């Protein structure tokens, strides 16, 4: 049986070679180590009667969303959604304009906001509470149905500030191909994101082919009121870091054999794939393409170091993806 570290990719790939061809299941991926790792791994776990064959019910794959399935710069997409709501609140109540995070939203002080996020990636949550105070009140009292309508409309009508495309078109084409390839080979794909569960659900099927019930993410507390569920101004689950494997197990009841992330917050999820008697594939998306997307490693330093130590597959957007969107 294969060891629990990175899967052996010596098996023949499902397309025969790593190059693109008419039968290539991953045409947006350039020939190279990352593509070969994917094809070799899937061939390994699906080979009928093979020593490392994994039954379909155990072919679970988990994916982070921000920076893994869709872009997260210059700010996470959901943060843009929330900031617009904070601006509307500050316009209605001028007293909020001198308080964070309404002040940052109203004055477009994205430096402060990005600083809070960067500190979080490095384990410093000293200002997260300040940001959360606004985030949690932004949609307090809103029903789950109304929130979904607002999120869906925002994603369909709002354009990315620098890429010039709607947010709904900011999903990575190579990752969508990968999701489809895995599903065609008997995998169940799940999103396991630090982003809001109910923010992603309206578009997960259309963008990724992932049904809403397979979306695992952060959530606010809900209360039953007047025949419906209503948002409360308090955190239920922050699905990041060590909470990711907890939530995956709670929802899925199985360890994944494939995990893809892009930041330090994804490390526990990637490590959760390790099993002594089954192969696994762990991948990190490296943002190194300023011409087509963005170039940054902030918040991923530890993950990249562990990738080198443990032999995880690092996917270079610049080198491994023939197209990005």
Description of each model-found segment:
Residues 2-5, 10-29, 33-39, 43, ...:
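C-terminal cap/substrate-recognition subdomain and adjoining C-terminal extension
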Residues 51-55:
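Short loop/turn motifs at secondary-structure junctions and domain boundaries
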Residues 58-74, 270:
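Asp-based phosphoryl-transfer active-site loop
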Residues 65-66, 89-93, 105-106, 205-206, ...:
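Short amphipathic alpha-helical patches
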Residues 74-75, 80-168, 173:
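A metal-dependent, Asp-based hydrolase signature
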